[in-house]
Amino acid sequence: MSALDFLVELGTEELPPKALAKLADAFCAGIEKGLKDAGLGFAKAQAYAAPRRLAVLVEQLATQQPDRSINLDGPPMQAAFDAHGEPTQAALGFARKCGVDLAEIDRSGPKLKFSRTIEGQPATQLLPGIVEASLNDLPIPKRMRWAARKEEFVRPTQWLVMLFGEQVIDCEILAQRAGRESRGHRFHSPGQVHISKPSSYLEDLRGAHVIADFAERRELIAKRVEQLASEQNGSAIVPPALLDEVTALVEWPVPLVCSFEERFLEVPQEALISTMQDNQKYFCLLDTNGKLLPRFITVANIESKDPAQIVSGNEKVVRPRLTDAEFFFKQDKKQPLERFNDRLKNVVFQAQLGTVFDKAERVSRLAGLIAERTGGDKARAMRAGLLSKADLATEMVGEFPEMQGIAGYYYALNEGEPEDVALALNEQYMPRGAGGELPSTLTGAAVAVADKLDTLVGIFGIGMLPTGSKDPYALRRAALGVLRILIEKQLDLNLVEAVNFAIGQFGTQVKSAGLADQVLEFIFDRLRARYEDEGVDVAAYLSVRAVQPGSALDFDQRVQAVQAFRTLPEAEALAAANKRVSNLLAKFEAKLPEAVEPRWFDNATEFSLYSALQQAEQAVQPLAAARQYREALERLAHLRGPVDAFFEAVLVNAEDASVRANRYALLARLRGLFLGVADISALG
């Protein structure tokens, strides 16, 4: 079957830059799906996108749909005709379903049959519908109309190219009649661009100062920005999202170096970077020490004969924004950071939980407790907690919300606060996302954990639990943040104590009955997904969850030990034995003896197990107390022999009540020894 290349390009007014790549990929995916559904084979489909165009090039597309055979079975002959040979409703209904007269139905077999070959349609007839369906299915949140047209799209359309081989496909889509005339660069080549065939698309447009390949433009910008930064003895900050957005804004990228006055470097560099990236789409430059250079890179969409004019224009545009940041910084420094807390007394954190200042005071006290328990400085943690929200009332954060915490850090340093206190004002928000950076100081860790626990307890305490995809207070992220800090920073905090302390601070503002258990369960539930991501078997997590350690660090140490224990040859048998013991003890209704009495033993294996347990207790209990859980489980693995022998030789449910109770006490002692680490019956 013959095949030709196919090209579709929809020209528009400037498309939303943040959505361009997504729209192009969806357009291509929709066409691929349409071709496959139609049975039209092809070699490859490639999406192209620039600010004023979406395009898809399909290589070696079949020119004809294959023929299809339809074979339908109808009702049995005895149901199709009555005793007089007249067709029944079943026969007539089958004929209607097939779209033919009953005379055309095959009656030669035991059932009515209908067979027909449907000739495949030419691709040229199918492609307009496939393209239109793909465009209709694009992920466009809000479509628009233009002029007096009824058609809707993300932006008004300007032209349409549809070529199959060298032939134009005659059709109209979104108010545009298909042709072979594209458009070049808006300034360098504003006229029509003749596309002779699909395979020449990229080069035809390149000659008109348009790089239609999004990936090519992206790479060109990234390399040139890196090169220019190096020439300035610096390195560029190139966030992937910003690079994508800039790529979507230009058809013919020309990166240029610009500069600003060095006096602006007195302003926190994060504020300068934020305004240059977010508002102006510039790439900022850092020196070898990570400090901001008074230069930036803009990406022009034109190859100017006088680049200095473009540079000058961008420098004039950015100056007022940097001046604003400088003004806010100087204004804020006119009063102590702590004084901004007065403004927070009028800012509501949550209607039922008081003001942001109330929260800062709670965080301060809780951070002090956490620091005290984890080897930090209580006074500094309390000071950092008290100042933790002050910068929310500053002019800087009011203008640049992303500066919360960062502004506080600079203002605290400026006032002579200890460095760990200043750092904590920023580190309280860490980690800012999955895999995000953790606090570098004990003070920062204490405030970060305190802030998150206060939010968890408060929001849970008023019954606003996260449901499904709705989590307005980011409680899942807060719980994960607490766990990451405590585990990865090796901080041994009793979360039961910390959560109860947090509850006590709210007084009657929260419903305290059962609240601690609810919050702790929510926090430790988050560990399951964490371990699954790390490749830890869920059974190891469940075995530790069953013994309910109060410390996240302790929990993790136990899980790692159980995971290692599972690799031992004795693990499977001991897990099964523990499960058997657990089931037996659950069914024992009498009161267990306080101690095991050897005088009730009547089998040598009972003595052997008892002796082995005594030796194991002496070795394991100190190990468990020292949290050397892996070594403890390795030592407990030696019990496999005595345990197997016991169950093989002894009937636990002896007729004599005293013997029976004593055997249950022996098994309870065995189970208790393992429960000092984890419930390994969960591994069985």
From Swiss-Prot:
One of its GO terms (cellular component) is cytosol. GO terms for molecular function: arginine-tRNA ligase activity; ATP binding; glycine-tRNA ligase activity. Its main location: cytoplasm. InterPro entries: DALR_anticod-bd (IPR008909), Gly-tRNA-synth_bsu (IPR015944), Gly-tRNA-synth_heterodimer (IPR006194). It comes from the Bacteria. GO terms for biological process: arginyl-tRNA aminoacylation; glycyl-tRNA aminoacylation. Pfam families: DALR_1, tRNA_synt_2f. Its EC number is 6.1.1.14. Keywords: Aminoacyl-tRNA synthetase, ATP-binding, Cytoplasm, Ligase, Nucleotide-binding, Protein biosynthesis. The keyword Ligase applies. Tetramer of two alpha and two beta subunits. This is Glycine--tRNA ligase beta subunit. The gene is glyS.
